[in-house]
């Protein structure tokens, strides 16, 4: 929440690039961490889920363009984080998906809704019900990502893309509206 709050309060912001400095974007939650969570009361679980949703919604609602650079695996909650960005650029070797559904856990941070708005209900249903990890080319075909590049070019394209948004060459405001 502090990162989102810092971005919201920054008067000089023009755009946000979301990127991991590690080999992978975000693997998502460690499923073993869910065991103690599921032992909590229904109210405590709702509070946790709503809190995470609130943070992601605030990021999605930023008044500047946002781009996620997916440099490795972005799975489960990690992919849901990518979906909150206005645009997603993916490395050729990266993979995305919602594998938690194989365990009977539905995406809890808005991923189901965001993916269906971005890629269409048919593709979202396939992704959610399969729990499959998807290659970059497949994600691009269903519009789950906006571009696929060699990993060495990811940062460069991300910078160029956000600058095009800031300069008004890409209508990022329209994209925000389309995702709602």
Tell where the protein language model's regions lie, with residue ranges:
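A structural preference for short, pocket-lining loop segments at secondary-structure junctions
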Residues: 1-42, 54-69, 91-95
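Hydrophobic/aromatic residues within transmembrane alpha-helices
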Residues: 18, 30, 81-82, 139
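Glycine-rich phosphate-binding loop at the start of an alpha helix
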Residues: 28, 49, 53, 76, ...
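A glycine-rich helix N-cap at a beta->alpha junction
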Residues: 45-46
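Glycine-rich beta-to-alpha active-site loop
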Residues: 56-103, 107, 127, 132
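Hydrophobic, secondary-structure "cap" segments at the distal end of domains
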Residues: 112-122
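Amphipathic alpha-helical segments at domain termini/boundaries
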Residues: 127-180
